[in-house]
Amino acid sequence: MPLATETVAERVAALRERVDEVTLATGRERGAVAILAVTKGHPRAAVLAALAAGLHDVGENYLQEAREKYADLPPCARHFIGHVQTNKAKAIVAAFDVVQSVDRLEAGLALAKAADAAGRALRVLVQVNISPTERFGATPEQAPALAEQLRARGLQVDGVMAIGPTDGDPDRAFAAARSVFERVGGTTLSLGMSGDWERAVRAGSTMVRLGTAIFGPRPARERIPA
């Protein structure tokens, strides 16, 4: 059963306060770190509840879910955070405002072509692999050159996204992501999820991707096609 709108609002308010506390402790201003509501596996009502609670950014891993839930939303930024399949680039460009998961030139070229055909600018982040268990992402060494190649194709590269390790030292991995971000440039370091966001903010994250912390566990359901 989806959480009540009031419950989502209470969780968002508590998270916003705590995110700001950690942000202030790093010497940055209140509000410097954005919260992205990850709605994967949750119904459209959850998306609307997050927006009603004052969040501006929502994110999905799967294109099909976004098609079902993200149509005709109130003003917001829709982020694609799943793996980019080149044959779905046109549909991704149509459904999202930001693509956080560009990890190779092939994907970037497909998105740039689709954005050009649609006559629109597309913001993207370079996904960087900082975890030995993560399947996707450019290496830290490859990422700056990839960012320049993407910019040369007309994409608005606004920073870096990374997924922290499930074991090992997250602080070291987060520091590596920040180092890449400083070389790539932009305004967005999308780093940190429900289980590790505080450490990510301390490492310099400017956007945390929170799903369980806002909505609770995802309901059991059949696998959604990408």
Q: What are these regions, as identified by a protein language model?
A:
Residues 202-203, 210, 215-226:
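Conserved catalytic-core subdomain
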Residues 1-188, 193-195, 201-203, 215-217:
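Conserved alpha/beta-domain cores
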